[in-house]
Amino acid sequence: MTSVDQLTKKCPYCGKMLLTLPGLLAQEEMGDSEQNALRGLEIVCTCEQSIYAERKLQAEIEASRRSTEAKEKAERTARRMAASNMPETWHRRGLSSWLRRTPNEQLAYDSAVAFGKRIQAGEHPSLYIAGPIGTGKTMLASCLALDLIRSGKSVLWSNVGDLLRSLRATFSSKEQNEEFVIDHFAQASILVLDDLGKERPTEWAAEQLFAIFNRRYDYGKPTIITTNYSGADLIKRLTPKPDMSGYADDTTARAIVDRLRGTASTIILEGESKR
């Protein structure tokens, strides 16, 4: 049988004797009828010093929990950054660093912030960022993409030229084929393609681009595009060169732009080159 000594503990602060009976949710303090709160099976004295110590302990536990969560969040963010294919030198960017010196730059900022909020709300919009060379299209897209990564979203970044080169590389690869590369880009949670139209595609390349955009359109996946060209000019730019008879088939180019613009909001950047 358990002795009384084994069922008592002494408050280290005030010296009161506390009776501990396993299984009780609360226990009277020995010597009076004051109730004591239990943490598990451990009685906590209600003296001022004990309450202060308990609160301090709980604060330390909470601080440790928050520190662990912050560390784990930073590690997850770092992994998403690495998987995004974005240059490490960009990783400090964010929309807060986007300069808003002109009404156009402010409008671009507001539109990018609104797009990010739609993504966070669970929507699946796309974004079309156009403007002359040097007006900040890549900067704006990268700032937005990095903010999305920090918020917990997975992003895949690629220059369109690099995408096409990765597709061409499958010609001599035994490990990857076109379908593997297309699916890699088509399945990305959020895809950012930089400089669409800079490289005029062949008929084959245009078909591969359409396959990616069409699947993303069908899957409802957000896509962010930067380009120097407006809709009509982009169609011309994505149309393969004319054949021997002088005929240029723009069917695929029109289909690409249709898929891009179907669910996309538009940001038009203006002004002189910042480079």
PLM segments and residue spans:
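A short, basic N-terminal segment
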Residues: 1-101
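Loop/turn-to-beta-strand initiation segments
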Residues: 125, 153-154, 187-190, 219-225
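Walker A/P-loop nucleotide-binding motif
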Residues: 121-141
